[in-house]
């Protein structure tokens, strides 16, 4: 494990996690493991993956994509099921679907339900897009993306839950450095 003495996170899907014999044999204790929730993934598979990761001394961070949820009742069901097995963190996303399955279409809507406070979550991450996101910002500017982060930043001031930003990996450092300067100038402190 000498190579892995720095903090890092990884991402798995329930199906690929099944191929790993024991996460504690390949990852340092308390590694943050994001669990991608694709549209065809059943919540029971997500929950079982969380249980397994906790049992193997990892920290599960399930994705909760707004656009695959039918309604806020289903959201509460997922949030409570995760909490029941010891999940204290999650990553909220709008999701890749162009058309929402129900009335929820943004991570802001998920935050505003109050379910995460109700079920004792401690950390919530939201998506960041240093290189932009064409689904959000139709131009090359980050206007809509930054507006969403400002709303989430304001929300973070009203809750005891710690909010953070998760980004996908990037191949070019310059857009990341530029994005961090923009966040600092806009006083976005997630």
Please provide the spans of the model-predicted regions.
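Short hydrophobic/aromatic-enriched beta-strand-loop microsegments
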Residues: 33, 189-190
